[in-house]
Amino acid sequence: MSGPGPREPPPEAGAAGGEAAVEGAGGGDAALGEPGLSFTTTDLSLVEMTEVEYTQLQHILCSHMEAAADGELETRLNSALLAAAGPGAGAGGFAAGGQGGAAPVYPVLCPSALAADAPCLGHIDFQELRMMLLSEAGAAEKTSGGGDGARARADGAAKEGAGAAAAAAGPDGAPEARAKPAVRVRLEDRFNSIPAEPPPAPRGPEPPEPGGALNNLVTLIRHPSELMNVPLQQQNKCTALVKNKTAATTTALQFTYPLFTTNACSTSGNSNLSQTQSSSNSCSVLEAAKHQDIGLPRAFSFCYQQEIESTKQTLGSRNKVLPEQVWIKVGEAALCKQALKRNRSRMRQLDTNVERRALGEIQNVGEGATATQGAWQSSESSQANLGEQAQSGPQGGRSQRRERHNRMERDRRRRIRICCDELNLLVPFCNAETDKATTLQWTTAFLKYIQERHGDSLKKEFESVFCGKTGRRLKLTRPDSLVTCPAQGSLQSSPSMEIK
């Protein structure tokens, strides 16, 4: 068979073929409605095929028949057609197919239906071939009007051809059954490996590429999280491969995704040559598995856990050095921050407690100094007890450190609340219902105004009365106290003066 065109009928069937051709040309579709050639769709289960699909299938069948040794397959099919074609059945089908303007359809389309033991295999082969052609040719536009008539005539011709093939299944069913597996397997292999020729007049938006379409289909549908159509042996091999790779290197990326083919070992600080080789081997193994249609199991994951754990350990060691609480220490020149670290020694613990107690002893001379002094003394005693408990307890123990931190935080908040209550009584525009942020804002504005009015004289006087290192009030002699007391009185009476 040299081309996709219809073959000439044998000499003994020539006259009948000519009559059928004349009848088909004159009567349109009348040849398709003969009572002797009518078959139900449940018996044959034929499907519609567009011109593009039929042209592709015809090219594939022609190439397979040319590749067959000594034309054995073609001879068998011709003998089956000669034995089955009645006086006007096969030739009438050829004439009807040629008249409609579409490519002719003849019984070569269903060679597997010639077997007597499996008469329904023609439907299965048609469905498989149609699905493969649809996946390769893409979305082909269907024509209307004359195209529908041509398709109907092609379907009628296919029915006639399939009927003739079914009629020949009786005497010649056994020799033709041997040709079925070879044709079917070779067709599937050709679809999977060798790209078919493009159609002469494609109706799609772009010419089809069967090989690229199949490769893209395999690449896109095979999602790593799903396992589709993979035998159990391949699953076991894939799992064993993953286990071996995991045992070889634990800090590297064991089995990379196709999109992420970079080497994850190069980012780690302690990477060596074996880890790099194992990661590159895993990438190559994955590429081979992709071509062999091996999916990845659902329970597959990336081995990033140990790197994350090492990072957590590094961050944990850094957090031990970070300060737990930052306390403001009143210095001689400026304000400096004292960091209380977790791994502090006993001597540093004592110094910190002394500084915090010193800050708690800051008192102002005035009418409400007694109540404030009691509050500060209670906070000082609680801090002393806290320091003793921290010293007596063991250095280790996460629960003890957490409890100590919670106590210190509660005490800090309590002291902030006491100071804000004091400021609400001293600072203008503040009362007991004012929140802490608003109180601090009014306090800042009030102190700036005092500095504008009085300059640094009050600041220097305050520094001379209180110790900058301990925060305690200096013990002054009688004449000094007589000199400083009016100044302090003017300091406390300044809010009322400013309000006026």
UniProtKB/Swiss-Prot annotation:
Chief subcellular location: nucleus
Keyword DNA-binding recorded: yes
Tissue note: Isoform 3 is testis specific. Isoform 2 is pancreas specific.
Annotated spans, R3 epitope (recognized by Chagas's antibodies): 347-356
GO biological process per UniProt: cell differentiation; negative regulation of transcription by RNA polymerase II; regulation of cell differentiation; regulation of cell population proliferation; regulation of DNA-templated transcription; spermatogenesis; transcription by RNA polymerase II
Location relative to the cell: Nucleus
Residue ranges of every copy of the bHLH domain listed in the record: 400-450
Chain segments carrying region R1 epitope (recognized by Chagas's antibodies): 481-500
Key words of the record: Developmental protein, Differentiation, DNA-binding, Nucleus, Spermatogenesis, Transcription, Transcription regulation
Biased composition (Polar residues): 370-393
Entry GO CC: chromatin; male germ cell nucleus; nucleus
Keyword Transport applies: no
Region (Disordered): 1-34, 191-211, 365-410
Domain of life where this protein originates: Eukaryota
Any one GO MF annotation of this record: DNA-binding transcription factor activity, RNA polymerase II-specific
Biased composition (Pro residues): 1-12, 196-210
Quaternary structure, from the entry: Efficient DNA binding requires dimerization with another bHLH protein.
Its biological purpose: Putative transcription factor. Isoform 3 may play a role in early spermatogenesis.
Extra remark: Antibodies against TCFL5 are present in sera from patients with Chagas disease (also called American Trypanosomiasis), a disease caused by Trypanosoma cruzi. Two different epitopes that mimic Trypanosoma cruzi antigens have been identified: R1 and R3 epitopes, which are recognized by T- and B-cells, respectively.
Protein name (record): Transcription factor-like 5 protein
Organism encoding this protein: Homo sapiens (Human)
